[in-house]
Amino acid sequence: MKNNYKSLVIVGSQWGDEGKGKITDYFSQKADAVVRFAGGDNAGHMIEFNNKRHKVTIIPSGVFNPKVKNIIGNGTVINLKSLVNEIKRLNESNISTDNVYISDRAHLIFDWHTLIDQLQEENRKENKIGTTKRGIGPSYADKAARYGIRICDLKSPNFKEIFKENLDYHNEIITKVYNHKPLDFDQIYNELLTNYQLIKNNIIDCGYEVSNLINENKFVLFEGAQGVLLDIDHGTYPFVTSSNCSANNASIGTGIHAKQIQKVIGIVKAYNTRVGSGAMPTEIKTELANKLRERGREYGSNTGKPRRIGWLDLVALKYAIRVGGIDQLFLTLFDVLDTEEKIKICTAYKLDNQIIHSIPANENDFKRCEPIYEELDGWNEDITKITSFEQLPINAQNYIKRIQEIVNVPFLGFSVGPDRKQTILIKGEFDD
């Protein structure tokens, strides 16, 4: 695989779980650095090679290549306890984490964030969002309210006072708003100091480092988390995550300028999935959903929750392409559709007897959208061993071609199985 780019952004173009980790791992074989720019350990990126499956939640997916610098950017939120546990887990699998670095400007997740996340979700009753309860939202809320504590604050001479003041403030919320017992200072503080000692030598100025790499003509891969349809501003609000998931945030979340981003690849699953609450017009309510769920192993990598299954929604995909700045697409879990005689794709919505071609802003309107389908012939053939686009059955080729025609964005490649080797480029600029 050749590469003519200095910077490449990989984003999810649906509701997350598209297989970004696998594709990031694939491109990281030629990268000098992989940088996470948003989210926290609510992500669950799965990478499979040498008959072994690995998961990373906050560490970039390039960690499996020892030659790659893996940087956790300033746009993320970091639970040091989770990060240290992930480092230990990788080390136990003989995977070095000496190449993992952390932005000094990244905000931290503490025990009070995870507790408040849980209490808020319980308080929503029937209006639950489906949060992972890992403290992501409350940490970003503190960042916006300027209560947040950053990695760089850990070395401040008065950090203990800063920490206590922050804990006291949150204990007021925990006890008086939610009637829950307060958190203990000593336990949380001592654990934090222990974990800080384990990572302090890997803290860097992310923007300075990444800008220098690009200016030196190194190849930097920016790894997104979740998906554009979960973006806090442009996703299906309020059933979204707490950060910006589009390529627009790759520069903000790493400390470089927007002109340093050259290309954006959107990862799209061959069908739709969604975790938690929120509308999904193409959701399948028949036994077929269970069949596809089992074939695609569609269970949350962090929570184990079964994912909701739907036909590929091209209205939502076109929206994600526009909002996410996507130049090319990469199709994943293509083989999951191998056994289907007929395959549907959604090309428009019907809302109040009108045909619309974009996602409405209002969630209640989105819930009322009816999908308008185009039906394609399936291929009913195992494609897991093919190694080129030309080897695909004609109907599988037609599936890719028809999507391209409708969304007017080309496919860079596709995946026909979980292993790194089952990733195939369509002829183009990345060919050897």
UniProtKB/Swiss-Prot annotation:
Keyword terms: Cytoplasm, GTP-binding, Ligase, Magnesium, Metal-binding, Nucleotide-binding, Purine biosynthesis
Protein name per Swiss-Prot or TrEMBL: Adenylosuccinate synthetase
Membrane-spanning residues: none
Binding sites annotated in the UniProt record for GTP: 16-22, 44-46, 307, 333-335, 415-417
Catalytic site positions: 17, 45
GO biological process, one term: IMP metabolic process
Cell cycle keyword on record: no
UniProt organism field: Mycoplasma capricolum subsp. capricolum (strain California kid / ATCC 27343 / NCTC 10154)
Assembly: Homodimer.
Chain sites annotated for binding Mg(2+): 17, 44
Protein family: Belongs to the adenylosuccinate synthetase family.
One CC-aspect GO term: cytoplasm
Subcellular location: Cytoplasm
Gene coding for it: purA
UniProt-annotated binding residues for substrate: 301-307
Residues holding IMP: 17-20, 42-45, 132, 146, 226, 241, 305
